[in-house]
């Protein structure tokens, strides 16, 4: 979609990265059916760095790009499918994607199961292999299916997908991590369960106030206006803009801002939002305040979308696609928006008859930006269920292996006890 070069995912380090002693110890054999079986020494994605042998088979390429190659494989011990992302590792740097993924543990983020290093064909070539959850579909492919059939994506799916995206953003933003490449292709989907998982942290970065960042980031259609203006001191609200573009695309059946170039991208945005005011330009990048833009009026949001588009969807979109970065909703505020109220109905099920995926198991980490929203985000039926679950499992809450999720998933039960 964009011809941009792949941004680096390497973080500077004062000394070369030390590879594990087991580096490159990859054994290939054949099973009784003649299938290729690969055994590697890998490190778990979370927890202590205790290396272990991991054996997989049925390897096939499912994606590639400037970043490297993605394979699908089957773990021999469990039969589970995984995705293995193989990227060239620069020995001078730590891999930023790996550092970030090892911190993350959330139901709406693809899980790093293991990682291992392997050698390449050339001398001194080192590859990092990330073993990830395999999820069969993407929002991009599902939306394209409906678009080609000249049908609108059912609004219940728009709500489910966007809500889970905002949950994942609330979680990573609570750590100061900005994804920087939110787009439908990076939103993995299980079509049976409607579970969404955010993937591809190759452009992600922990943003630090006062430290500059590259502005040529994010795929063009989803690029926030401050990035087009060349800002280098942007915040994680660029992810919120991108999410707003995804929401608009799911409602429209096509990208809302389909620019042919960086400049044309801004033209497409101005066609909808109108010309930014001097103050809005200052908020995006102070260096552009004297630049003269043609004065164009904003297009009414109700005319941007189809006639039957729910007013709450339009209202949410208008709060995400704001020129001023600080005026955009936070991901947690977005989750609490009335557009998602239907998801809080205890009697609702998926169109295929299945139960909804987990939507209310908020962690204290997720809620940290605005804990007062828990009364909206965790509906009464979920609070009651959490309270019952906590009562019956009081002896199991100290499991030392639960990490971030286990130790913080009691936000709902804490909210229940506070409300009783």
Swiss-Prot record:
<feature type="region of interest" description="Disordered">
    <location>
        <begin position="384"/>
        <end position="420"/>
    </location>
</feature>
<dbReference type="InterPro" id="IPR050591">
    <property type="entry name" value="GSK-3"/>
</dbReference>
<keyword id="KW-0963">Cytoplasm</keyword>
<dbReference type="InterPro" id="IPR008271">
    <property type="entry name" value="Ser/Thr_kinase_AS"/>
</dbReference>
<keyword id="KW-0547">Nucleotide-binding</keyword>
<keyword id="KW-0879">Wnt signaling pathway</keyword>
<dbReference type="GO" id="GO:0090090">
    <property type="term" value="P:negative regulation of canonical Wnt signaling pathway"/>
</dbReference>
<dbReference type="InterPro" id="IPR011009">
    <property type="entry name" value="Kinase-like_dom_sf"/>
</dbReference>
<dbReference type="GO" id="GO:0043525">
    <property type="term" value="P:positive regulation of neuron apoptotic process"/>
</dbReference>
<dbReference type="GO" id="GO:0016055">
    <property type="term" value="P:Wnt signaling pathway"/>
</dbReference>
<dbReference type="GO" id="GO:0007399">
    <property type="term" value="P:nervous system development"/>
</dbReference>
<dbReference type="GO" id="GO:0048511">
    <property type="term" value="P:rhythmic process"/>
</dbReference>
<dbReference type="GO" id="GO:0010975">
    <property type="term" value="P:regulation of neuron projection development"/>
</dbReference>
<dbReference type="InterPro" id="IPR039192">
    <property type="entry name" value="STKc_GSK3"/>
</dbReference>
<feature type="region of interest" description="Disordered">
    <location>
        <begin position="1"/>
        <end position="50"/>
    </location>
</feature>
<dbReference type="GO" id="GO:0010719">
    <property type="term" value="P:negative regulation of epithelial to mesenchymal transition"/>
</dbReference>
<dbReference type="GO" id="GO:0032007">
    <property type="term" value="P:negative regulation of TOR signaling"/>
</dbReference>
<dbReference type="GO" id="GO:0032436">
    <property type="term" value="P:positive regulation of proteasomal ubiquitin-dependent protein catabolic process"/>
</dbReference>
<dbReference type="GO" id="GO:0045892">
    <property type="term" value="P:negative regulation of DNA-templated transcription"/>
</dbReference>
<keyword id="KW-0723">Serine/threonine-protein kinase</keyword>
<comment type="function">
    <text>Plays a role in the organization of the formation of the main body axis of developing embryo. Acts as an inhibitor of differentiation of primary neurons. Inhibits the ability of ectopically expressed NEUROD1 and other bHLH factors to promote early retinal cell differentiation. May participate in the Wnt signaling pathway. May regulate the circadian clock via phosphorylation of the major clock components.</text>
</comment>
<dbReference type="GO" id="GO:0030424">
    <property type="term" value="C:axon"/>
</dbReference>
<keyword id="KW-0221">Differentiation</keyword>
<feature type="binding site">
    <location>
        <position position="85"/>
    </location>
    <ligand>
        <name>ATP</name>
    </ligand>
</feature>
<dbReference type="GO" id="GO:0030877">
    <property type="term" value="C:beta-catenin destruction complex"/>
</dbReference>
<dbReference type="GO" id="GO:0030154">
    <property type="term" value="P:cell differentiation"/>
</dbReference>
<protein>
    <recommendedName>
        <fullName>Glycogen synthase kinase-3 beta</fullName>
        <ecNumber>2.7.11.26</ecNumber>
    </recommendedName>
</protein>
<feature type="binding site">
    <location>
        <begin position="62"/>
        <end position="70"/>
    </location>
    <ligand>
        <name>ATP</name>
    </ligand>
</feature>
<feature type="compositionally biased region" description="Polar residues">
    <location>
        <begin position="1"/>
        <end position="24"/>
    </location>
</feature>
<dbReference type="GO" id="GO:0005737">
    <property type="term" value="C:cytoplasm"/>
</dbReference>
<dbReference type="InterPro" id="IPR000719">
    <property type="entry name" value="Prot_kinase_dom"/>
</dbReference>
<feature type="domain" description="Protein kinase">
    <location>
        <begin position="56"/>
        <end position="340"/>
    </location>
</feature>
<feature type="active site" description="Proton acceptor">
    <location>
        <position position="181"/>
    </location>
</feature>
<dbReference type="GO" id="GO:0005524">
    <property type="term" value="F:ATP binding"/>
</dbReference>
<dbReference type="GO" id="GO:0005829">
    <property type="term" value="C:cytosol"/>
</dbReference>
<dbReference type="GO" id="GO:0010508">
    <property type="term" value="P:positive regulation of autophagy"/>
</dbReference>
<keyword id="KW-0472">Membrane</keyword>
<keyword id="KW-0217">Developmental protein</keyword>
<dbReference type="GO" id="GO:0008013">
    <property type="term" value="F:beta-catenin binding"/>
</dbReference>
<dbReference type="GO" id="GO:0004674">
    <property type="term" value="F:protein serine/threonine kinase activity"/>
</dbReference>
<keyword id="KW-0597">Phosphoprotein</keyword>
<keyword id="KW-0539">Nucleus</keyword>
